């Protein structure tokens, strides 16, 4: 698909150490991408998102668009906004998350979503946004080494039956 290849291709060209890119449309992330509220690590597993999650906005560079990364120029622009970071929000669209392996990229994606939900809840509870306590850079560095071997096995166990059930509902294409 052109859209995914532009996103993934731009990042793979810019980041040779990346072997997995996850693009998603998490509704928990959209508010952070459209308000400019920084998405910051708020709990121990949130450290996997790193110290900064930039927001890529296509409008300044490309004018009014449909918010989709439809060509390689936009893919390169998104990759530049991501830089050396682990994730980037896409204004009004979703996010991209990267990793050296699929389990790492998927783990970061899941915990990015969890972190966004927790941060939004904390901001709602706080009388003043400055009352919310985030992880500092040292805590992020101390925690971000976490691997996903155990989580990956659990996610596979949980998702394989669901994916198999969905596959069973799809019609089998006729033989040529």
Residue ranges and their predicted role:
Residues 1-176:
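Glycine-rich flexible loops
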């Amino acid at each position: 698909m052109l859209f995914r290849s532009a996103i993934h291709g731009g990042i793979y060209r810019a980041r040779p150490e990346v072997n997995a890119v996850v693009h998603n449309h998490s509704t928990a992330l959209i508010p952070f991408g459209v308000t400019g509220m920084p998405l910051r690590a708020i709990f121990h597993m949130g450290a996997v998102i790193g110290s900064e999650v930039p927001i890529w906005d296509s409008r300044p560079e490309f004018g009014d668009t449909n918010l989709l990364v439809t060509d390689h120029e936009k893919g390169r622009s998104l990759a530049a906004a991501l830089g050396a970071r682990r994730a980037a929000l896409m204004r009004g669209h979703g996010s991209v998350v990267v990793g050296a392996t699929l389990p790492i990229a998927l783990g970061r994606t899941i915990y990015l979503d969890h972190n966004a939900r927790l941060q939004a809840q904390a901001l709602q509870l706080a009388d003043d946004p400055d009352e919310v306590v985030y992880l500092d850079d040292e805590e992020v560095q101390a925690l971000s080494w976490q691997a996903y071997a155990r989580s990956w096995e659990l996610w596979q166990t949980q998702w394989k039956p669901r994916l198999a059930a969905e596959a069973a509902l799809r019609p089998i294409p006729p033989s040529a």
